Amino acid sequence: MIIRHLSENIINQIAAGEVIERPANVVKELVENAIDAGATRIEIVTANGGKSFIKVSDNGCGIPADQLTLAISRHCTSKITDDVHNIYFLGFRGEALPSIGSVAKLKLTSRTQEAENATEIIVTAGKIIGPKPAAANPGTIVEVRDLFFVTPARLKFMKTDRAETNAISDMIKRIAIAFPHIRFSLSGLDRTSMELPATANSTQGQLQRITQIMGKEFAPNSIALNAKRESIRLTGFACLPSFNRSNSLHQFAYVNRRPVRDKFLWGTIRGAYADVMARDRYPVSILFIDLPPADVDVNVHPTKADVRFRDPGLIRGLIVGAIHEALHQIGVRPASTCSEAMLSAFQTSQPLGTFKSTHQTFSSQHHHLASAAASPLHKPLDATNFVNLREEAVPLMECLDMPSGDICTANTTPSSEELHYPLGAARAQIHKNYIIAQTQDSLIIVDQHAAHERLVYEALKDALYSKPLPSQLLLIPEIVELSEEDATCLLTHKDALQKFGLGIESFGPGAIVVRETPSMLGEVNVQALIKDLADEAAEYDTTNNLKAMIDCVAATMACHGSIRSGRLLRAEEMNALLRQIEATPHTGTCNHGRPTYIELKLADIERLFGRK
């Protein structure tokens, strides 16, 4: 077999296979080039999901006429010279334009601010035409037609036009969040599908841009983040635990303003919410990590979607600590989406006559009450009507026996001071599980079991971690065989593991002996536990799996040791529970991620009854 030197066009096509997977990748590369050029206005036009036509226009610095040929040549760039460790631009490899030109019909038109005329160059399947003079405003216009016409087999892997357009839209949104000062627009050949006006390049402008993309419900359900460790700064927004989604599509992470989809960051964010969100739910979050370029490697993935941090443990600690601190500081603040869902459940237009009795002991003498209530009033009611109605209604109410709807009311009128509490004063308990509380301007519904479960769980954790956890000695120490590297890495966490009741020691190269395990875990599969911890230590330089297992046991204990549904509470007990909820962190959700209380504003109640 003869070794041959591949042609430049074949090399570009191979590179395109890595960099250009779908039309959204083309848009990403071209938009990033526009941002690097200092553009403040970027317009994207597509047709057929970008498969037949893509046009990206910007008002950036433009490309000098004598450098257009270099711009479409492989590994020609103005963004780096001889240092690949300090990268300050989104693009730096010089692969995008030649890769696109090798698999599509590419037209590049550019003009600098100083030039009188624009210049264009055309590349079709690697063949170059031009450059030649053209007419255009200062900036750059890139047109891409018939993507993958050179490699039609790739078109078979494309999704529908709608799916590809949605992927392009999602890509633009992810980039636009990091650059609020840039105006973005996305349109088809006949209509504009997305318009993002420029905002101030500040925290407020950032939130305004995020609201444009995420919707109005994001701001009231988010918490601002601002933390720093050493030379690394974390800013952005984290959501309330009860404001979550069923997938990770609403998690946005940026490293030096570069959008990334990094599994390490996703796992870290979910880990920060582990105690307050259900396992099958994902937080809505937008994180910006700014650090020296030398501390992160962005050149580890063809599309630069993944990154590698020099100190991942520091990054993990910063993110988890910042989110925990933010959640601790919010106090009593339910997600507005819970209240909106509650409001939408009300059926205010349902006629009274459509309600059916669930009780079978109604006597026939009371049936006329329902029909009278549902029929129109033909004459005004006088005082006698009201008296008669009340006399008939009393025995009717006495005959209703509905245990599931038992109501225990507080006989005392709440003071103005009690109404000033975040969760107000308890007014009643319904269905032997829900506490109804009143504040100055709202009504609060509390799930007593879920709320007390969180209180017990937090108290258990405080008691557990205030001192080293008790351990149980193994009758026969167990030896676990690992690779020498994994064993060495895990032993560096020996002291931390000892605090959780796990005693390990070296037992020669590539082996660890386990002499004691946490008492809380009871019988444990030592082999599986040590191997899982070794994998985690090798990949993330942490051993959080053990803490997660202990937390899981504590959560189970809290669930079984809390106030059960069906228990009647006195007014004093209900108010004491409300005050404990206010004083304890993370009480917005139970251990399983469900809301513990819901707030319904007085203004919303008045709207339900048509008062506002």
UniProtKB/Swiss-Prot annotation:
PANTHER family: DNA MISMATCH REPAIR PROTEIN MLH, PMS, MUTL, DNA MISMATCH REPAIR PROTEIN MLH1. CDD domains: HATPase_MutL-MLH-PMS-like, MutL_Trans. This is DNA mismatch repair protein MutL. GO terms for biological process: mismatch repair. Keywords: DNA damage, DNA repair. One of its GO terms (molecular function) is ATP hydrolysis activity. Pfam families: DNA_mis_repair, HATPase_c_3, MutL_C. The keyword Transmembrane helix does not apply.
